[in-house]
C-alpha cells in the first residue's frame, strides 16, 4: 500500500 502498515485486507 501507499503507507507502511496499511493493510486493505484485514
From Swiss-Prot:
> What's any one GO cellular component for it?
extracellular region
An annotated Gene Ontology molecular function? toxin activity
Compartment(s): Secreted
Statement: the UniProt record of this protein carries the keyword Transmembrane: no
- Would you indicate the residue range of the signal peptide? none
What are the entry keywords?
Amidation, G-protein coupled receptor impairing toxin, Secreted, Toxin
In-chain residues carrying the UniProt-annotated modification Arginine amide: 10
Q: Which domain of life is it from?
A: Eukaryota
Main location, first listed in the record: secreted
- UniProt miscellaneous comment: Has been extracted from the spider web.
What does the protein in this record do? Causes constriction on isolated rat ileum preparations and relaxation on rat duodenum muscle preparations at amounts higher than bradykinin. Is a partial agonist bradykinin receptor B2 (BDKRB2). Is moderately lethal to honeybees. May be related to the predation of insects by the spider webs.
Q: What does the sequence similarity comment in the record state about its family? A: Belongs to the bradykinin-related peptide family.
Q: What is this protein called?
A: Nephilakinin-1
Amino acid at each position: 500500500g501507499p503507507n507502511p502498515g496499511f493493510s486493505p485486507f484485514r
